[in-house]
From Swiss-Prot:
Other comment: The complex HlyBD-TolC (OMF) forms a single transport channel across the two membranes, allowing direct export of alpha-hemolysin. These channel is involved in type 1 secretion system.
Gene name per UniProt: hlyB
Keyword field contains Transmembrane: yes
Family statement drawn from the similarity comment of this UniProt entry: Belongs to the ABC transporter superfamily. Protein-1 exporter (TC 3.A.1.109) family.
Protein's UniProt name: Alpha-hemolysin translocation ATP-binding protein HlyB
Peptidase C39 domain residues: 3-125
GO biological-process terms attached to the record: protein secretion by the type I secretion system; proteolysis
Protein's job: Part of the ABC transporter complex HlyBD involved in hemolysin export. Transmembrane domains (TMD) form a pore in the inner membrane and the ATP-binding domain (NBD) is responsible for energy generation.
Length: 707
């Protein structure tokens, strides 16, 4: 067997490409399932293996001159097994950036070098989620399926709009008859008939107009509800990394952009578009009256469009600046209210007020620029309208004087022209709203187009046992950030109580975040009961893992609602039992409303120790198989901590427990203590075993606390 088969480059390529598409892969499992003869993955088996990972793959033949049109990275397949990954094509420089699987390094190839290696076979790769994401991208096209869904209602709206346009056509004709026939021939009987008919038309026009507005508002309200529900569901399904990389105020500002879309959908903009679409009916009648006057109206329409096109880019930039400043204000406001205790304690209100005044002044200035530009745009529209009116008046009067047009026809023509120009002017005047909605859709798209935690096709076993394995874990929060965990190998048996200690920033809490599948490691696997968490349903996992943090958040509900948050229908007895284990029952019983006491926003009505004990009860109430205490007792007074530690045997019974603590006395009775330093496990053992090594880090930390 030659060297190219000693190392399976196909398997290595699959591992790299899967990682690129945020798909976890177990090389040993792939090898076991698809490399049955041990000679490496062939083309067919490689494609099957990729599809088993939910990757969308397609093998194609491409000439070199067509490679700059394909989606990269892609796998270049070679018959001798020495495949490589094509990552970038520069046709101008005739260079190719590849990842050499044999050298395990990127390389830049000249045209001649690439031609020598390329055999014409290439495999295109995309993740299913990315394909779905592209299809479901949120922009203006998102509303098309919604319109199709409610097509019956929109068809009714269109029918009503047609009748409204016909009624609008009848009214000018009546005025023409009155001016040219009734007044000239003094036909009172004809006048009475026309008046009655016009009254009937006006009544029907009002009824149909109100009906159209009602139908349209009803359907757009449904779309609004769907969009709002989709937005909130999507927001809660986003990974925790999304929120950690963005300011709270910025996310809130983006969500509030839904109001702009709502106002646009329920406003007059869309009905104006419908009115404009049926304007061809009026053009036909107007042309019959006077081609010259009609041409004046026709030539004015591009002027409206050109003026709007000229204003739009500037207006959009200023609206974008206004939004950014508003988002900054939202973030600063949320931050200030959240940190109000710190602000008051440090007496920094004047400094915070000064910052707010500057930011508010910037926002107001940006808003003023938008208003000024919008006013200029509207006045430009008015100028075009008045100019057209003057030209039509002058030309129409000439036509009447020359006998080519009657006075009644001129009046009717101007009324018909108004039916065309009015929606155009309305659309031009609400162009600012449309620009705002365009920005709102883009901003909202930042939320809705962000990939959620994947649930489809994930493992969802009924119950876990609690065996945890970290295998060759390497992790960093961002590609350009320092390594947080490096080569972590750790096995935790079912029912074991593990203490994790170390200096701040050593990676202790990150380890537990991987157990909760908040993140997927850059390299290696986290296994629970032998199942890779990268392939697990996050909700299934988190329902069976109880977590108590150093700073827990309670919702503005009753105590019983907070404890039974994950299962609101559970019995009161279970809630009370969990509260007793957490040492919370006694103080809850002393409250006037007991378990029905409203805790306030983020638990503001309770002390820090009380909030912590309720959080512990909340973690215990579902009887999780894995329980994580991340500095959970650091905020407790000694009496409360004593109650927790006294009940620790009951708390730990039948479950795997991980305790992260700076206070080493908290973990001295653990089955095993893991000592971490700079993202690595440097020591592990029982309390006495670690203390027996005087030069150990654990001994050093213990000595510091003893002193």
């Amino acid at each position: 067997m030659d060297s190219c088969h000693k190392i399976d480059y196909g398997l290595y390529a699959l591992e790299i490409l899967a990682q690129y598409h945020n798909v976890s892969v177990n090389p040993e499992e792939i090898k076991h399932r698809f490399d049955t003869d041990g000679t490496g993955l062939g083309l067919t088996s490689w494609l099957l293996a990729a599809k088993s990972l939910e990757l969308k793959v397609k093998q194609v033949k491409k000439t070199i001159d067509r490679l700059n049109f394909i989606s990269l990275p892609a796998l270049v397949w070679r018959e001798d097994g020495r495949h490589f990954i094509l990552t970038k094509v520069s046709k101008e420089a005739n260079r190719y950036l590849i990842f050499d699987l044999e050298q395990r390094n990127p390389r830049v190839l000249e045209q001649s070098e690439f031609e020598a290696l390329y055999q014409g076979h290439i495999i295109l790769i995309a993740s299913r989620s990315s394909v779905t994401g592209k299809l479901a991208k949120f922009d203006f096209t998102w509303f098309i399926p919604a319109i199709i869904k409610y097509r019956k209602i929109f068809i009714e709206t269109l029918v009503v709009s047609v009748f409204l346009q016909l009624f609008a056509l009848i009214t000018p004709l009546f005025f023409q008859v009155v001016m040219d026939k009734v007044l000239v021939h003094r036909g009172f009987s004809t006048l009475n008939v026309i008046t009655v008919a016009l009254s009937v038309v006006v009544v029907f026009e009002i009824i149909l107009s109100g009906l159209r507005t009602y139908i349209f508002a009803h359907s757009t309200s449904r779309i609004d509800v769907e969009l709002g529900a989709k937005l909130f569901r999507h927001l809660l399904a986003l990974p925790i990394s999304y929120f950690e990389s963005r300011r709270v105020g910025d996310t809130v500002a983006r969500v509030r952009e839904l109001d702009q879309i709502r106002n646009f959908l329920t406003g007059q903009a869309l009905t104006s578009v419908l009115d404009l679409l049926f304007s061809f009916i009026f053009f036909a009648v107007m042309w019959y009256y006077s081609p010259k006057l009609t041409l004046v109206i026709l030539f004015s329409l591009p002027c409206y469009a050109a003026w709007s096109v000229f204003i739009s880019p500037i207006l959009r930039r200023r609206l974008d600046d206004k939004f950014s400043r508003n988002a900054d204000n939202q973030s600063f406001l949320v931050e200030s209210v959240t940190a109000i205790n710190t602000i008051k304690a440090m007496a920094v209100s004047p400094q915070m007020t000064n910052i707010w005044d500057k930011q508010l002044a910037g926002y107001v200035a940006a808003g003023f620029k938008v208003t000024v530009l919008a006013t200029i745009g509207q006045q430009g529209i008015q100028l075009i309208q008045k100019t057209v009116m003057i030209i039509n008046l002058w030309l129409g009067a000439h036509l009447v004087i020359s006998g080519d047009l009657s006075i009644g026809q001129l009046i009717a023509f101007n009324m018909l022209a108004g039916q065309i120009v009015a929606p155009v002017i309305r659309l031009a005047q609400i162009w600012q709203d449309f620009q705002q909605v365009g920005i709102s859709v883009t901003r909202l798209g930042d939320v809705l187009n962000s990939p959620t935690e994947s649930y489809h096709g994930k493992l969802a076993l009924p119950e876990i046992n609690g065996n945890i394995t970290f295998r060759n874990i390497r992790f960093r929060y961002k590609p350009d950030s320092p390594v947080i965990l490096d080569n972590i190998n750790l096995s935790i048996k079912q029912g074991e109580v593990i203490g994790i200690v170390g200096r701040s920033g050593s990676g202790k809490s990150t380890l537990t975040k991987l157990i909760q599948r908040f993140y997927i490691p850059e390299n290696g696997q986290v296994l629970i009961d032998g199942h890779d968490l990268a392939l697990a349903d996050p909700n299934w996992l988190r329902r069976q893992v109880g977590v108590v943090l150093q700073d827990n958040v309670l919702l503005n509900r009753s105590i019983i609602d907070n404890i039974s948050l994950a299962n609101p229908g559970m019995s009161v007895e279970k809630v009370i039992y969990a509260a007793k284990l957490a040492g919370a029952h006694d103080f809850i019983s002393e409250l006037r409303e007991g378990y029905n006491t409203i805790v306030g926003e983020q638990g503001a009505g309770l002390s820090g120790g009380q909030r912590q004990r309720i959080a512990i009860a909340r973690a215990l109430v579902n009887n999780p198989k894995i329980l994580i205490f991340d500095e959970a007792t650091s905020a407790l007074d000694y009496e409360s901590e004593h109650i927790i530690m006294r009940n620790m045997h009951k708390i730990c019974k039948g479950r795997t427990v991980i305790i992260i603590a700076h206070r080493l006395s908290t973990v001295k009775n653990a089955d095993r203590i893991i000592v971490m330093e700079k993202g690595k496990i440097v020591e592990q053992g029982k309390h006495k075993e670690l203390l027996s090594e005087p030069e150990s880090l654990y001994s050093y930390l213990y000595q510091l606390q003893s002193d």
